[in-house]
C-alpha cells in the first residue's frame, strides 16, 4: 500500500469478524512470482455468493475497506495486502 496523509474515498463495509489471510487470499493464488494481479483471488470463496459485498454496485470503486475485528489474522503473507491493493483498496480500517 502507498503511504499518504489524507485519503478521501468511497467505503465498502465487510461485515465479518476474524477474517484471516487465507480468507483474504487462499494459498492456491500464491504461486505467482510477480507482485501484481492478485485481485482475482481476493475473498475468492466468498465471491461465489452473489450477495457478497464485492458484487454490490453501490460499493463499486470503493477505496476504503471497513473491516470487522481481527481482520488479517493468521499466517503472514504479503499477498493479502497485494490482493487488497490490486482490487483498488487504499485504506483498511
From Swiss-Prot:
Molecular-function annotations in GO: 3-isopropylmalate dehydratase activity
Catalytic reactions of this protein: (2R,3S)-3-isopropylmalate = (2S)-2-isopropylmalate
Top-level taxonomic group: Bacteria
Entry keyword annotation includes Phosphoprotein: no
Keywords, ordered alphabetically: Amino-acid biosynthesis, Branched-chain amino acid biosynthesis, Leucine biosynthesis, Lyase
GO biological process: one example: L-leucine biosynthetic process
Enzyme Commission numbers on file: 4.2.1.33
Species in which this protein is naturally found: Actinoplanes teichomyceticus
Assembly behavior: Heterodimer of LeuC and LeuD.
Pathway membership, UniProt: Amino-acid biosynthesis; L-leucine biosynthesis; L-leucine from 3-methyl-2-oxobutanoate: step 2/4
Pfam families: Aconitase_C (PF00694)
Protein name, entry field: 3-isopropylmalate dehydratase small subunit
Function: Catalyzes the isomerization between 2-isopropylmalate and 3-isopropylmalate, via the formation of 2-isopropylmaleate.
Family, per entry: Belongs to the LeuD family. LeuD type 1 subfamily.
Record InterPro entries: Aconitase/3IPM_dehydase_swvl, AconitaseA/IPMdHydase_ssu_swvl, LeuD
